[in-house]
Design a protein with these regions (language model features):
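C-terminal TM-helix exit segments that contain a strictly Trp-centered aromatic cap at the helix terminus
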Residues: 22-30, 93-105, 169-175
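Internal/C-terminal transmembrane anchor helices
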Residues: 148-185
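Short active-site neighborhood of thiol/selenol oxidoreductases, capturing the structured segment around
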Residues: 265-283
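Membrane-interface helix-boundary motifs at transmembrane edges
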Residues: 2, 76-83, 143-154
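Functionalized membrane-embedded alpha-helices
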Residues: 6-28, 56-97
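N-terminal "domain-start" segment that seeds a small globular fold
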Residues: 177-267
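Membrane-embedded alpha-helical segments of integral membrane proteins
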Residues: 92-145
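Solvent-exposed, well-ordered loop and adjacent helix/strand elements within mature globular domains
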Residues: 23-63
């Protein structure tokens, strides 16, 4: 029985540790990206006006450092009871957040793995449920975690981990990320990044038309729109996503001539030879 517990505990520990380390690292090397994701959460709960940008940036660095450090503590069995309890608290909070995201969908991507891996809210919730169960197992039997370093050396590893992950965040903040998972990373082929593979799932929409007749406003769909009744006056339209399809890594790139309003995207991307662009926020 003890052998079964040992195997179960250490498998749960490895799953949690590797997930925390990977998740914390990919967010730590892109602190600005993590800041933007925090801003999305604050916007969803209408608190963005109360939290300044510099606070969001500090939060992004601190949260990624905590997650990465917790993963190393679990991997090396540093402070087994403490790390197990903190991981349970952390996963309880994250599971509650992703449950809210799954039900309400105020944000399409939780950002748990930065730009490295994108999961749907439902996939993230299932992932967090599995990790929550793993954390419960560790809290129940913390002493079955096998140590990799002695008690006297565990604090050396702990402090080294904190210094390492904080330095990684600072270096990535002032320079390019060590590993760049962003859509516009150096060497990216923008044209290929915008392509949709053949046979890829298409996004399906529900289009609603708002029309007015004799002071009465009514909504129509594409199926029952009064095409042959000219007495209905079109007022507005809106679209609702019924099922999300494939979205290319680069889906928001465009170049427009401000003077003429012409779209120059295709002409520039399809031009032979080199194209040099000077981009400046302030002219």
């Amino acid at each position: 029985m003890n052998k079964v517990k040992t195997i179960l505990v250490n498998l749960s520990r490895a799953l949690l540790a590797l997930t925390f380390i990977f998740s914390g690292f990919v967010k730590a090397i892109d602190p600005l990206g993590s800041q933007y994701k925090i801003a999305e959460y604050l916007e969803a709960v209408q608190l963005s006006a109360y939290v300044p940008d510099w606070t969001q940036l500090i939060l992004s660095i601190v949260l990624s450092a905590i997650e990465f450090t917790l993963g190393v503590m679990l991997l090396l069995a540093i402070r087994r009871r403490f790390a197990s309890k903190v991981s349970l608290i952390f996963m309880t909070c994250m599971t509650a957040v992703t449950l809210w995201l799954t039900i309400s969908e105020p944000i399409q991507d939780c950002g748990c793995f930065g730009d490295a891996i994108h999961l749907t809210n439902t996939q993230t919730f299932i992932k967090n449920l599995i990790l929550l169960i793993a954390a419960l197992i560790l809290v129940r039997w913390p002493r079955y975690q096998s140590r990799f370093i002695s008690k006297t050396n565990q604090w050396i590893a702990f402090y080294f981990t904190i210094v390492f992950i904080c330095l990684a965040s600072v270096l990535s903040l002032y320079h390019l990320p060590i590993f760049d998972f962003r859509p516009y990373h150096i060497g990216q082929n923008i044209k290929k990044g915008m392509e949709i593979p053949k046979g890829a799932k298409q996004t399906t929409y529900k289009t609603t038309f708002i029309c007015e007749k004799n002071g009465v406003t009514k909504e129509f769909t594409e199926k029952n729109y009064p095409y042959n009744d000219s007495t209905w006056v079109f007022k507005d339209t809106h679209q609702e996503v019924l099922e999300q399809g494939y979205e290319p890594p680069i889906h928001d790139f465009s170049i427009t001539d401000e003077k003429t309003g012409d779209d120059l995207t295709d002409s520039i991307l399809n031009k032979d030879g080199y194209t040099f662009m000077l981009i400046s926020p302030v002219l």
